Each structure stands twice: as structure tokens, then as C-alpha cells.
Amino acid sequence: MNTTPRIGLGVDVHPIQPGRPCRLLGLLFDDADGCAGHSDGDVGAHALCDAVLSAAGLGDVGAVFGVDDPRWAGVSGADMLRHVADLTARHGFRVGNAAVQVIGNRPKVGPRRAEAQRVLSELLGAPVSVAATTTDGLGLTGRGEGLAAIATALVVPTG
């Protein structure tokens, strides 16, 4: 039996949609516009989903949730993470730990970092660290046109 831990990487980018609620890292931010998308536009949760799925060899968010499947329309990033954690467990892995970095100007993640880490860790059943950065005015995130996130995850075989 293979007992080697596996590492995955996930990236997500969405454009800002003025007036849409901002859901990020499993939290609601009242002081910023949210991202457009088939689901809730939570780039942090989506990047984490991709990282876990890729580590477990289960594809990516598009393969699991689709981009136009009505069953997943408007689904929260939190529900997506729950589903990914369950799917990963059914395929013989558990999340060991994960990290996610949000790239954008707003919302400010720092003041709610501990809350986001707690929520995401509960959803995945493993420690999740959260970081944020800007691009110093460069690109779509720097101009405030979108948000991006990159994540890594370690999964461990349970067998």
C-alpha cells in the first residue's frame, strides 16, 4: 500500500461583480464587492478545492462541479470544501494541511485571518493557514477588477 503523502496546487481567479456579496475564505465581507461566478465566487475556497483535488488525483473544480451544472449554481465555497473533503476521504485520503493566499486589494483579509483559518480548518478537517498580498497596482487584481488565490494542500493516504 502507498503511504506517501501527496501535494497539490490550486489557483482561482474571478472578476469583481459590483453589488454582489463578497464571499471569500468561507466568510462574508460586507465592505467589498464580490466576485462573479457560477457559484459564490469565493476564490480562496475554490483554490483550496483545486489544491486538495489535485493532490488526491481527483481532477479540479471544473471536473467535479462543472461550470454550468444547475445542481451547483450559487453553491457556497464552504459547501464545495465540504464536498471535496468528503470526496477525498471516499478515495482514501485525508487532508494533512493546506495554505491559501489571496491576491487583491479588497477586502482586507488580515483583520479576519484567524476567523478564516478557523472556518477553513473546520471545513477541511485539517490546519489551514491564510495569507494575503497585493500586486502593487499591477494587473487585474491591482486595478481592483478581480481577485485571485493560490493554494497548496497535503493529503495523506488513510488506508
Curated annotation (Swiss-Prot):
Name of this protein: 2-C-methyl-D-erythritol 2,4-cyclodiphosphate synthase
Binding site for 4-CDP-2-C-methyl-D-erythritol 2-phosphate: D12, V13, H14, H38, S39, D60, V61, G62, T133, T134, T135, D136, R143
EC number from the UniProt entry: 4.6.1.12
Cofactor: a divalent metal cation
Pathways per UniProt: Isoprenoid biosynthesis; isopentenyl diphosphate biosynthesis via DXP pathway; isopentenyl diphosphate from 1-deoxy-D-xylulose 5-phosphate: step 4/6
Annotated source species: Mycolicibacterium paratuberculosis (strain ATCC BAA-968 / K-10)
Pfam family, one: YgbB
UniProt similarity note: Belongs to the IspF family.
HAMAP family: IspF
